[in-house]
């Protein structure tokens, strides 16, 4: 029996498999970082790997709300860059 790894997107609030989401983690020193390995320790928030969720998340500040900390534009740009190739 395999264990499912479902997480909720901070933007659209849908439950999805962990692999379908980006993880942003708040590491020591209160610095948000994109965690592509899903293994960095710290408070994490998830957002879908599509441009609509990223745009909505930026507009609604959903990642900031989930992490209780500001998230820099560079992280959103990095996620968009990964999606667009």
Model-derived regions: residue spans:
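Cys/His-coordinated zinc-binding microdomains
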Residues: 13, 49-54
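Short, non-ligating residues that shape and space the ligands of small metal-coordination modules
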Residues: 18-22, 54
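C-terminal structural segments of small proteins and small subunits
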Residues: 55-85
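Short acidic-glycine loop/turn motifs at beta-strand connectors
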Residues: 27-29, 49
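Short metal-coordination and nucleic-acid-contact micro-motifs, chiefly zinc-binding Cys/His arrays
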Residues: 5-8, 41-44
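Short cysteine-rich loop/turn motifs with clustered Cys
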Residues: 6-17
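Flexible extramembrane loops and terminal tails that flank transmembrane helices
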Residues: 1-2
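Short linker/helix segments within small regulatory modules
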Residues: 30-42
